[in-house]
Amino acid sequence: MYKRQTPDSVKTLVSEGHEVLVENNGGFEAGFDNDQYKNAGAKIIEKAADIFNDAEIIVKVKEPQKVEVEMIKENQIVYTYLHLAAAKELTEGLVKSKSINIAYETITDDNGRLPLLAPMSAVAGRMSVQAGAHCLEKNQKGRGILLGGAPGGEPANVLILGGGVVGENAAIIATGMRAKVHIVDKSEERLKQLVKMFGDKIITEQSDKVDLNKL
């Protein structure tokens, strides 16, 4: 279903002559119901096994589960996030299936960027600060520190390792909550870009010139 598994992308594919099969309630958790997909021209299929059996191309978000790997056919094309580096069993299963697998996280654009990984990284970066702030609360057995401080109290120190998409988005939330933010990255050029973005709201350090224990 293109880069986004939405009714709009289904409509585009159908208009180009493709047949699109959607698993029953497959879009429910993302806020899309069966009728939206049907109105876009998709066929709603009750069982995932039937989709794996009939489709030439499988489009997913999460890596194939063990039961799904067993359903993948030879030469079937599978688009999804795979993260195979830490998944030996999944890797071996896909190799055995002789299918063609394209991992979203490895697709690059003309500038060498990872456009399909960036949205997930942005979410991860923003959520990390929220989760950290939550864990600092006393009722979570934290130190009882507010990320942005309070009258008479210092704000929390937030150390961000890496200034990529994850780090940048973590900094957006951390600076927005008025924490003290340090960003460490190996690239001097990237750190300069971040300073342009955040100004004096952050302190930057090159990773080969800093003692993390002192931050």
Show where each model-derived region lies.
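Short beta->alpha connector loops at strand-helix junctions that form conserved
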Residues: 23-24, 47-48, 81-83, 103-108, ...
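Short, hinge-like loop/turn segments at secondary-structure boundaries
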Residues: 38-41, 119-122, 199-203
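Short, charged, surface-exposed secondary-structure boundary motifs
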Residues: 55-56, 88-92, 112-114, 193-194, ...
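An N-terminal-biased, well-structured beta-alpha scaffold segment characteristic
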Residues: 3-93, 97
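Residue-level detector of alpha-helix initiation sites
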Residues: 63, 123, 164-166
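Short gly/ser/thr-rich secondary-structure transition/capping motifs
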Residues: 39-45, 60-62, 138-144, 203-209
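Glycine-rich phosphate/diphosphate-binding loop of Rossmann-like nucleotide-binding domains
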Residues: 3-31, 141-215
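Glycine/serine-rich phosphate-binding loop and adjoining beta1-alpha1 elements at the start
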Residues: 66-156
